[in-house]
Design a protein with these regions (language model features):
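Amphipathic alpha-helical segments
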Residues: 87-102, 143-150
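Glycine-rich beta-to-alpha transition loops that act as phosphate-gripper elements at the mouths
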Residues: 1-2, 22-28
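Alpha-helix-loop-beta-strand connector modules within alpha/beta enzyme cores
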Residues: 3-21, 63-73
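Catalytic cores of alpha/beta
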Residues: 6, 12-16, 26-42
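Vicinal oxygen chelate
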Residues: 57, 118-123, 148-185
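Glycine-rich phosphate-binding active-site loops on the catalytic face of alpha/beta enzymes
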Residues: 1-5, 39-62
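Hydrophobic faces of well-ordered beta-strands that scaffold small-molecule active sites
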Residues: 19-24, 41-45, 81, 133
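N-terminal beta-strand motif that seeds the catalytic metal site of vicinal oxygen chelate
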Residues: 70-95, 128-135
């Protein structure tokens, strides 16, 4: 499709059941944007594997470019840190303290309160002895597949969906007293 993401988005309206596999116009800087679009199935392109690198047998370079592309496509980044508080009062007290110290603001919630967007304070102990670390990704299902290849497992009982799309899930492993919460950006 000529016209990049905007053209594919326009076509996905009347043809909602189709998925695209763009190979032109995709590069290391925009692969995350492409792969996070709901109407994109996969991406590719010659930027990953140049003819010169193939001819010169620079497979280490090609492997590194592919690793970087995969990292860019997944787009892992810290979203917030979750702290386990014993109860709702302690949760609000900690949020107010963080607000007083750093001017983050306080946002009350159902099962937790937030100090700004960086700190979530649970109203009751939840996963992780100390709390959780929320890691955002461009695609939770793709992140799960990648993490499983790396030897990590998800806890399916924690999965959250928007319609049929997986939008959040916790990993089973403990990371220094913290659970890892994968969330859709």
């Amino acid at each position: 499709v000529y016209g990049g993401l905007s053209a594919m988005k326009a076509l996905s309206g009347p043809f909602g059941g189709i998925k695209f596999i763009p190979t032109g116009g995709v590069n290391a800087q925009n692969v995350g944007e492409y792969i996070s679009a709901p109407f994109i199935h996969a991406v590719g392109g010659s930027w990953l594997c140049s003819k010169a690198d193939i001819a010169a047998h620079r497979f280490d370079r090609i492997t590194e470019l592919c690793r970087r592309a995969r990292a860019a496509a997944l787009g892992f980044e810290l979203v917030h840190v979750g702290v386990n508080a014993p109860d709702a009062d302690a949760s609000m007290e900690l949020c107010r303290m963080l607000d007083a110290a750093f001017g983050l603001g306080v946002r009350p919630g159902n099962s937790s309160n937030f100090a700004g967007s960086a700190v979530e304070v649970m109203k009751a102990p939840y996963l992780g002895a100390s709390g959780h670390i929320a890691i955002g990704t461009n695609s939770v299902p793709r992140a799960v597949a990648e993490l499983e290849k790396r030897g990590f497992a998800v806890d399916p009982s924690t999965a959250k969906y928007k319609g049929e799309k997986l939008t959040a899930v916790y990993l089973r492993q403990d990371f220094g007293g913290f659970a890892i919460h994968l969330v859709q950006k």
